[in-house]
């Protein structure tokens, strides 16, 4: 009985230390596609990317003036 309790204690210590080494949220970032990241990243981006099995929660950057097509400006020039 003491050996079983000791074995469980050692497993508990090992599991806690390995999660601390890898990081607290290690498993939350692992993914296969963007759907796996949706719950974790929903507060930052509506459809996150899964790059190399890791969730990318960075929001898309806003387009610069060079990236905006001219048709977007022509509709506002009538005012």
Swiss-Prot record:
Instruction: Identify the domain of life.
Output: Eukaryota
Quick one: signal sequence residues?
A: 1-19
Q: What is its main location?
A: secreted
Biological process GO terms, please?
defense response to fungus; killing of cells of another organism
Q: List the disulfide bonds.
A: 31-50, 37-55, 41-57
Task: Name the GO cellular-component terms.
Answer: extracellular region
Q: Where is this gene product found? A: Secreted
**Keywords of the record:** Antimicrobial, Disulfide bond, Fungicide, Plant defense, Secreted, Signal
* Similarity comment: Belongs to the DEFL family.
Official protein name in the record: Putative defensin-like protein 309
């Amino acid at each position: 009985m003491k050996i079983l309790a000791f074995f469980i204690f050692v497993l508990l210590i090992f599991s806690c230390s390995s999660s601390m080494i890898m990081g607290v949220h290690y498993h939350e970032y692992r993914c296969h596609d963007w759907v796996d990241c949706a719950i974790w990243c929903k507060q930052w981006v509506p459809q996150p990317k899964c790059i190399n099995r890791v969730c990318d929660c960075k929001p898309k950057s806003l387009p610069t003036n060079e990236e905006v097509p001219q048709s977007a400006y022509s509709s506002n020039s009538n005012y």
